[in-house]
Design a protein with these regions (language model features):
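Hydrophobic alpha-helical hairpins/lids featuring a short glycine-rich hinge
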Residues: 80-121
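Membrane-interface starts of transmembrane alpha-helices
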Residues: 44, 105-109, 152, 308-312, ...
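Proline-centered turn/helix-capping motifs that create local helix->coil transitions or kinks
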Residues: 119-131
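Juxtamembrane helix-capping/reentrant segments at transmembrane boundaries
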Residues: 34-46
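Alpha-helical transmembrane segments
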Residues: 1-30, 54-94, 126, 133-136, ...
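Short aromatic-rich membrane-water interface segments that cap or initiate transmembrane helices
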Residues: 43-46, 78-79, 137-155
């Protein structure tokens, strides 16, 4: 537990201290969101704040995991999976920063995220199995005792990359109101940290450290991003947070062999996922491009009803908390029944 607190505190402290420098650098280099019809900011806003989030997260993980490495004689600390998460996060930090400056086309954004997912797979982070309500009809290896379907390599890679893509894009999509994405990600990461700490696996404590570092980085960034925001996280922040949350859920929440295992990570990340599904559905019905930016997201619709930014943020925080509490309850059911 001490290590988890240290990871969160270090990440929060580093992120909070670095953000003002990142803000000045973003303004100087031109990484700024200009006011326009689909945005809510009324003045230019520095948008590369994710640099601070990434640095806070990275420094906290390196320090705490290395500390645990020496305390545990290297057992289940600096594993290939942990290295894969950091490498994939670093790749998306670079790609996200490029997008914050150059506004990459949708196909290049998709390619960057897919490559990050493949990096995770190459380092052993993948969805190995899921609960299967259809029994053994999907092929592969099926265990009827726990209703667990072990995926083929091809299916495993596909679902892993798809999950990483969905989570990363959905986190990016909710970054539209001051403090929203950082707060929701902090709530989700805290839930995943609690789950990881209860896993009866050697890597559970290390996963908890990584999740705690995300919590700390988000809270440290909120010091500057909560309304009225002085800086936004930009693509770099949203992509790093989405990637790490997706990876932690794969290594933790998906491991529960029970009828609820697929629901757990979906509920933990329910706010961005359900919002994104709703928006995509409305775009399809309107025959609008799926990648087109618009004001169909929940936070936009609440603002249009006359809510202020703080009301919107705290309402969505509350929804996220309810979903995460539900996920924790289902996780306990799955863990005890396994």
């Amino acid at each position: 537990m001490t290590g988890i607190l240290v990871a969160a505190i270090v990440a929060a402290f580093v992120t909070m201290l670095v953000t003002p420098s990142v803000r000045r650098w973003s303004e100087k280099m031109g990484a700024v969101d200009q006011p326009e019809a689909r945005r809510i900011n009324t003045a230019p806003m520095p948008r590369a704040g994710g640099i601070a989030i990434f640095l806070g997260f990275l420094i906290a993980v390196v320090l705490t995991v290395t500390g645990r490495h020496f305390a545990r004689s290297g057992q289940h600390t600096w594993t290939m999976q942990v290295l894969g998460v950091l490498l994939a996060a670093t790749w998306l930090a670079i790609a996200g920063l490029v997008d914050d400056f150059k506004n990459l086309a949708a196909r290049w954004q998709a390619l960057a995220i897919i490559l990050a997912g493949l990096i995770l797979v190459a380092f052993g982070v993948r969805i190995e199995g899921i609960t299967n309500p259809l029994g053994s009809t999907l092929g592969g290896k099926y265990d009827p005792l726990v209703n667990w379907h072990t995926l083929s390599i091809g299916a495993s890679i596909f679902l892993t990359v798809l999950w990483v893509f969905i989570v990363t894009k959905t986190v990016d999509a909710i970054d539209g109101v001051d403090g929203l994405a950082a707060g929701v990600c902090a709530i989700s990461a805290a839930t995943l940290a609690l789950m990881a700490a209860q896993l009866h696996t050697p890597e559970g404590p290390t996963l908890a450290l990584i999740a705690a570092a995300i919590v700390g980085a988000c809270l440290g960034f909120l010091r500057h991003n909560y309304h009225p925001a002085k800086i936004i996280m930009g693509t770099i922040g949203a992509w790093v947070l989405g990637l790490v949350l997706a990876a932690i859920s794969i290594m933790g929440a998906f491991k529960v062999a029970a009828a609820v295992s697929v629901l757990v990570p979906v509920l933990v990340l329910g706010v961005p996922i359900f919002d994104y599904i709703h928006v995509l559905t409305r775009r399809l019905l309107a025959r609008a491009p799926l990648t087109a930016a618009d004001k169909r997201h929940l936070h936009h619709r609440l603002l249009a009803r006359g809510w202020n930014q703080k009301q919107v943020v705290w309402f969505i925080y509350s929804v996220a908390i309810v979903l995460c509490i539900t996920a924790l309850a289902l996780f306990q059911v799955g863990r005890l029944s396994h």
